[in-house]
Amino acid sequence: MAQPTFFQSPPPMTLAAIAAKAKAELADVSQGDKVIKGLAALDEAGPMHLAFFDNLKYADQLARTNAGACLVSPRFEARVPGHVVVVRANQPFRAFVQLAREFHADALRPQPWFGDDGISPQAIIDPTARLEDGVIVEPLAVIGAHVEIGAGTIVGAGAVIGPHVKVGRDCNVGARTVIQCSLIGNDVLIHPGCSIGQDGYGFIFFGANGHTKVPQTGRVIIQNHVEVGAGTTIDRGSLRDTVIGEGTKIDNQVQIGHNVTIGRHCLLAAQIGLAGSLTIGDNVALGAKVGINNHLTIGDGAQVTAMSGVKDDIPPNGRWGGFFAKPTKQWFREIVAVERLVRDQTATSRDEGRE
């Protein structure tokens, strides 16, 4: 069976042209006419591929690679095998990504699955909805009353957009995504299977008649250039809005509770859980599976390591980790101290056993 390809193949290109595009230089300019037909990882590259190397963890792969050429920094240039053309770059990975973005522009954002012919006859669209020219609505999508959708937006198969929702221009609403009570800016990519704008988790707990539901009357506001990973859930606010700031990138399967405010250009890795009424500043990075308690403030530029549990405010530019999270230097010192204590106790027990 032929190997399936999901993205367009780049055109063949000489190494001289590639070096110019990547703002790199050939160690041997006589190799400038050599033709490259694609990009590949070191361990999968063939003679017609360009690879990159910038991490000594992959030194063995570099030594065995069959790549025709390799982007590499001057400090690692001597490690490149003789049969591989050296393409010298100060930041090889950035240069590689720059080339990949040009060669595979169709992979930068989700494309229509069922063609680009506008509105599918299998879609259901309320007559009061307003769709600008160039909107694509795929089969079995449902668009409710008074919805507004901007030009260039794709609504994926089986997606549901509830009444009065506003979606900006050049957005992607992934297949089987559900959006309600939300205002969404321009150039927002929402991957398949997301739920946005549903009730927040608000109750008065353990009353005389059990748990009393608190009305959730806020909205979700997603600003421009945000990306929301597959399976992510974003609850609407109870009184104030849940806000996702401009340029923030959210990984798959993240839970964002009601009333949360996330600043601009934040990074949230997979399976994070954010409890309600958090305030997260700009340029914050949260590792995978971080959990943060409610009503906290995470300062601008803070970073939290993966699988940490946060129960206290974090100051701007703080580097925290652990369970419960604390400044990473303190956390590492405590880990070392505990390991030393266990080691000493083990040694003492052995000595006592000999007696």
Swiss-Prot record:
Keywords (A to Z) from UniProt: Acyltransferase, Lipid A biosynthesis, Lipid biosynthesis, Lipid metabolism, Repeat, Transferase
Acyltransferase as UniProt keyword: yes
Entry's EC annotation: 2.3.1.191
Short name of one Pfam family: LpxD
Coiled coil in keyword set: no
Any single Gene Ontology cellular-component annotation: membrane
Catalytic activity: a UDP-3-O-[(3R)-3-hydroxyacyl]-alpha-D-glucosamine + a (3R)-hydroxyacyl-[ACP] = a UDP-2-N,3-O-bis[(3R)-3-hydroxyacyl]-alpha-D-glucosamine + holo-[ACP] + H(+)
Disulfide bonds: none
MF GO annotations: N-acyltransferase activity
Spans through the membrane: none
Record pathway: Bacterial outer membrane biogenesis; LPS lipid A biosynthesis
GO-annotated biological processes: lipid A biosynthetic process
Entry annotation: catalytic residues: H258
HAMAP family: LpxD
Assembly behavior: Homotrimer.
Family of this protein: Belongs to the transferase hexapeptide repeat family. LpxD subfamily.
Function recorded in the entry: Catalyzes the N-acylation of UDP-3-O-acylglucosamine using 3-hydroxyacyl-ACP as the acyl donor. Is involved in the biosynthesis of lipid A, a phosphorylated glycolipid that anchors the lipopolysaccharide to the outer membrane of the cell.
Protein name: UDP-3-O-acylglucosamine N-acyltransferase
Organism from which the protein derives: Bradyrhizobium sp. (strain ORS 278)
